[in-house]
Amino acid sequence: MIDEFNGITYLVIFIIHFAGYAFYAFRCVLSTKAFVDQYGMGDGAAIITRFFGGIFVGSVLMALNIMFIRSEGLEGSWAFFNLIFLQNLCVFLVSLFANRQGSLGTNEKTSIEGYIAPGVLTLLSALLCYGLADKIYWNLILCK
């Protein structure tokens, strides 16, 4: 498995990235009340919180599929990794943009986690796209 990920470094980055996704999936879907209370969002935010948690669940399941089940492993999985990177980047940029737009959604419980977590996830997913390029873009290289 280590060779599949071009060494231990990218395997660890993959595990850390999707462990973060699994953490937020759990918090949003199964621990919704504690999550919305932690950030002072109120019970009305539960539905949309679970909606976004569901997106994390799907990504974690796909990552587990690529890691353990898919016969090709990482080969040709460029669309998944690029989608993950773009989602992370968009969440990071939107959080920065929203911060500049004013105080909507901020309260005494708001933390910088809303900026830091997407930034870290964006960096990790960019590293995965770069470090695994020879594997994930394999089918695209053969088509040329």
Regions found by a protein language model. Name each.
Residues 2-21:
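Hydrophobic transmembrane alpha-helical segments in integral membrane proteins
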Residues 63-82, 100:
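Juxtamembrane helix-break-helix junctions at the cytosolic face
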Residues 80-98, 118-124:
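Hydrophobic alpha-helical membrane segments
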Residues 39-43, 74-80, 106-115:
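Non-cytosolic membrane-interface motifs at loop->transmembrane helix junctions
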Residues 19, 24, 46-68, 85-92:
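Core segments of alpha-helical transmembrane spans in multipass integral membrane proteins
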Residues 16-48:
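Hydrophobic transmembrane helix segments
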Residues 127-144:
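Juxtamembrane boundary at the C-terminal end of a transmembrane helix
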Residues 93-114, 133:
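Membrane-helix boundary connector in multi-pass membrane proteins
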